[in-house]
Design a protein with these regions (language model features):
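Alpha-helical metal-binding/catalytic segments enriched in His/Glu/Asp
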Residues: 35-36, 106-107, 117, 200-255, ...
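Acidic, glycine-rich active-site loops and adjacent beta-strand->loop/helix elements
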Residues: 107-108, 130-131, 180, 208-210, ...
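His/Asp/Glu-rich mid-to-C-terminal helical/loop segments that flank catalytic regions of hydrolases
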Residues: 232, 344-407
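Second-shell loop/turn segments in exported
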Residues: 14-22, 103-107, 151-153, 178-179, ...
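Metal-dependent peptidase/peptidase-like ectodomains
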Residues: 199, 248-347
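Soluble metallo-hydrolase cores and metallopeptidase-like ectodomains found primarily
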Residues: 64-67, 71-85, 89-91, 139-217, ...
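N-terminal capping segment at the start of a domain
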Residues: 1-23, 38, 132-145, 209, ...
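Noncatalytic luminal/extracellular "stalk/propeptide" segments of secretory-pathway proteins
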Residues: 3, 7-98
Length: 407
């Protein structure tokens, strides 16, 4: 793909596009139109997502109002309770949550939420941002349905600066108000198929949604551009295997697009011999990495291929928190590609993820490697990757997908 078109796509999509919103739909339509311009005909596959309109979100600590954003889908109501800062996850610390509104560090995942409920917490406060950054941005977060399992307590998100100030001042009592209208909305995957000589399928995935503060250039319009570039390359060629490009919606909300795709196409998943995923490439710093949820032979092959074509790649056997994982969980070997930026050189899920993080030459280099790998897999007489998931990866899939708690 020409550099000017790559840069134009980044410019045209430089806005927030949370899963299930009209902005996400707008980008889906844009991707479909770009596909048409390349000679392909993409289709929408819609799926249902939880949505909420926050009408009111207020937080007071010892009478002082703290700027906050209410958690989507946590319910509505008003609380007054003692504040408790959960600085440790050990049993004694958790036992002190009973009857309290609990301030927690880090992300509110499934197991932490279950611990809060089991120990009698009545509400929660999370925080994000960085005390060293000038902004006071607050991310919009949600209590995901697979986390709550229908058991909801009120929650808000605040800026890290306020969290530190609250703990430093030994905050005692909290009043929390959240009012919202919860409903079902629509997100969509954008799917383009390029028929091959056989009915074996290789899937290509990249998500196009962003988080609530982010333009999502690095995470993950870069991956979307990668897929568009590869579609441009393979359209009109004679390909041994069928190619299916899937721009996934609502990845940032829990891999919802790729999960929906696998659920809707259960009967034909056995035809998919390999999944290739792109999530965050082309940044200025760092090097190309491939995360393979597959046999070690694929890991070694990618390392050798990097030497062969002169584009270094660091390949590892691991689970990737991206749209490759639902496919791997269905027994499909996957290779996910990213360029991991060193600490302090690029950041995601905030307002700093813009086109400024991207270097077009690195985009083209990363895409060239992924395309070279894909072409070999597409046209191999027999797909060289065993269609199996090793036991050690199955164990990690169980942990990642919350079927088993990590020890």
């Amino acid at each position: 793909m020409r550099s000017k078109l790559i840069e134009k796509i980044f410019r045209d999509t430089a806005y927030v596009r949370m899963g299930g919103t009209s902005e996400e739909r707008r980008v889906a339509e844009y991707i479909r139109d770009v596909c048409a311009g390349l000679g392909g005909e993409a289709q929408f596959e819609e799926f249902e997502v939880d949505m909420a309109d926050i009408k009111r979100a207020e937080l007071y600590v010892d009478g002082k109002k703290i700027e906050c954003r209410g958690y989507m889908c946590c319910g509505s109501g008003e609380l007054f309770a003692e504040l408790y800062y959960l600085a440790s996850d050990d049993k004694r610390a958790l036992a002190a949550c009973r009857g309290k509104i609990v301030l927690i560090d880090g992300y509110l995942g499934y197991w932490k939420y279950r611990d809060l409920l089991a120990n009698g917490a009545v509400g929660f406060i999370t925080y994000d941002g960085n005390v060293n950054y000038a902004d006071r941005d607050i991310d919009r977060r949600e209590l995901r349905s697979y986390v709550s399992q229908g058991e909801k307590i009120l929650g808000v998100n605040i800026n890290a600066k306020d969290a530190v100030a609250i703990v430093n001042a030994n905050g005692k009592y909290v009043r929390m108000i959240v009012e919202q209208d919860e409903y079902k909305g629509k997100s969509q995957n954008v799917v383009l198929e390029i028929p091959g000589e056989t009915d074996e399928i290789i899937t290509f995935t990249a998500h196009y949604d962003s988080t609530s503060l982010s333009q999502g250039a690095y995470d993950n319009m870069s991956g979307c551009v990668g897929l568009l570039s590869m579609a441009e390359y393979f359209i009109g060629r004679e390909n041994r295997r069928t190619l299916r490009f899937i721009w996934c919606g609502s990845e940032e909300r829990g891999l919802l697009g790729s999960k929906a795709y696998c659920a809707a196409h259960e009967e034909e998943l056995e035809k998919i011999v390999l999944g290739i995923n792109i999530d965050m490439i082309g940044c200025i710093m760092g090097g190309l990495t491939s995360i393979c949820t597959a046999e070690m032979r694929l890991v070694n092959y990618l390392s050798y291929l990097g030497d062969e074509i002169g584009i270094p790649v660091h390949a590892v056997q691991e689970i990737h928190s991206s749209d490759s994982t639902p496919f791997a969980d269905k027994g499909i070997p996957t290779a996910s590609f990213c360029r991991r930026a060193p600490m302090g050189t690029a950041t995601i899920h905030n307002s700093y993820d813009t086109k400024k993080l991207i270097k077009t030459d690195n985009m083209k280099s990363d895409i060239a490697f992924i395309t070279a790998f894909a072409e070999r897999m597409i046209n191999a007489v027999n797909c060289p990757v065993d269609r199996t998931i090793p036991d050690n990866m199955k164990e990690k899939l169980d942990e990642y997908l919350l079927r088993k708690r990590k020890k």
